[in-house]
């Protein structure tokens, strides 16, 4: 449920909200599951950047390319609507009966030397924000599990 409600205009990215808002992203990370945000289908978009941010008229929103309920969400941007082809995916892998592992993968196809340089410069920021996202989801999921687990 946490992954389905991701987005700048929904549940946030569960990362470093103050840092995101310091650069004007206007994130509000949800600390509960919102029933109104629990439906996500192929073709919907997950907004990462609000309209107008740093001159981006439409902001940045990644379309949902594939979704397998309770298992994975794949977001993909590609030409001609976007400058380059990129995929950001989330995969929930069951571990034992009461645990799971969340894998986050990203890749992009770069055609110009400047794009490669940009990706290398953005790498540390992406790593930091991905770590924040993983820790934020972990904290929320574990907290919900502690509250809702059956008595021992």
Regions found by a protein language model. Give the residues of each.
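Hydrophobic ligand-binding cavity/cleft-lining segments
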Residues: 1-44, 140, 146-152
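Beta-strand/loop substructures that line and gate deep hydrophobic ligand-binding cavities in soluble
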Residues: 76-139, 148
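Short beta-strand segments that buttress and anchor functional surface loops
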Residues: 46-52, 73-80
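Short coil-to-beta-strand transition motifs
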Residues: 53-61, 82-85
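Short, conserved beta-turn/loop elements at beta-strand boundaries and strand-helix junctions
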Residues: 68-73, 97
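Acidic/polar residues at beta-strand termini and the immediately following turn/coil
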Residues: 67-68, 79
């Amino acid at each position: 449920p946490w992954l389905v409600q991701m987005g700048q205009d929904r549940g946030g990215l569960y990362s470093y909200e103050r840092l995101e808002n310091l650069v004007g992203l206007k994130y509000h990370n949800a600390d509960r599951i919102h029933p109104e945000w629990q439906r996500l289908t192929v073709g919907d978009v997950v907004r990462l950047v609000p309209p107008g941010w740093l001159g981006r008229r439409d902001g940045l929103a990644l379309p949902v390319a594939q979704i397998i309920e309770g298992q994975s969400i794949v977001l993909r941007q590609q030409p001609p609507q976007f400058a380059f082809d990129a995929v950001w995916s989330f995969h929930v892998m069951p571990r034992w009966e009461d645990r799971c592992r969340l894998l986050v993968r990203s890749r992009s196809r770069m055609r110009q030397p400047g794009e490669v340089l940009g990706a290398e410069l953005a790498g540390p920021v992406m790593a930091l924000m991905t770590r924040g996202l993983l820790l934020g989801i972990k904290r929320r999921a574990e907290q919900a599990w502690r509250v809702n687990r059956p008595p021992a």
